[in-house]
Every structure is written in structure tokens, then in C-alpha cells.
């Protein structure tokens, strides 16, 4: 699928390959171009090298650079500050969701989640990207 017919470009970063595959499959089925990263450093590099990212999905706890730190960085860069971010985590600490929202995330999804829950949250995220 070419960028001309896609609904947008979404950066997805998670150190769990199964989660990456699931999120990518759902987003591609919805017509998005998906850029994946296996850790925070890869996500940071993708942000620097990719153009036209319309939304991002980050795991809270990733090697090298945690999700909230990536979001804080995005909020300091003019070209990234309006990109909506969804955070996900399997950790049960409620502080992580507070930290994610404080960093600037707009959607938070605890793992494990159902495909329907993920689709609902992704639609919310993409709705933010369009507004």
C-alpha cells in the first residue's frame, strides 16, 4: 500500500514481538502505514528518520528509552508535539498510567487486552490524530 492511499503513518514500539505483530496487523487492516520499533532507541531513531507520523503507540517499559521518556522528548520538539501517543503496559503499578498521562500520552491501555479493546483505543488515538 502506498503512502498516498494510507490513512496515516503510525509508529509502534514494544519489546514484545507478539504485541508488535498484533498492533501492526490491526492498524494495517484499518489502512495505516505502520513503522515498528523493538525498543525505545529504535523508536527514537524512527522519529528522527520518518516523516509524516500521525500517531504513536509505545510500551511504557522498554529497553534503552522508556515510553514516557519518549513522549516527554516528543513534547519538546515542535514537529512531534502534536502527535497523539497511546501507552501500553503489562505492569500493574497505577503510577505508570499517571506518569504516562503526565508525560503527554492521550490514551493508556493495560495489558493483557482483548483485540476489541485494542481496536477501540486505537480508534480513539487515531481520532485525536485527525483533530
Where are these regions (language model features)?
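The feature encodes the CheY-like receiver
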Residues: 20, 63-64, 81, 93, ...
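Short, glycine/charged-rich "phosphate-handling" switch motifs in NTP-dependent
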Residues: 106
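Short hydrophobic/Thr-rich beta-strand motif most characteristic of the beta2 strand and flanking loop
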Residues: 31-38, 46
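C-terminal output helix
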Residues: 113-122
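Charged docking surfaces used in two-component/phosphorelay signaling
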Residues: 21-29
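Active-site beta3 strand of CheY-like receiver
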Residues: 51-58
Amino acid at each position: 500500500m502506498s503512502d498516498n492511499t494510507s490513512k496515516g503513518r503510525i509508529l509502534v514500539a514494544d519489546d514484545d514481538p507478539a504485541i508488535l505483530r498484533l498492533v501492526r496487523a490491526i492498524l494495517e487492516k484499518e489502512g495505516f502505514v505502520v513503522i515498528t520499533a523493538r525498543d525505545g532507541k529504535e523508536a527514537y531513531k524512527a522519529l528522527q528518520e520518518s516523516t509524516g507520523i500521525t500517531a504513536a503507540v509505545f510500551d511504557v517499559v522498554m529497553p534503552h528509552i522508556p515510553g514516557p521518556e519518549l513522549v516527554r522528548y516528543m513534547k519538546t520538539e515542535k514537529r512531534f508535539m502534536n502527535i497523539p501517543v497511546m501507552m501500553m503496559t503489562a505492569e500493574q503499578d497505577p503510577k505508570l498510567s499517571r506518569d504516562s498521562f503526565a508525560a503527554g500520552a492521550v490514551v493508556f491501555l493495560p495489558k493483557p487486552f482483548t483485540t476489541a479493546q485494542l481496536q477501540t483505543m486505537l480508534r480513539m488515538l487515531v481520532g485525536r490524530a485527525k483533530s
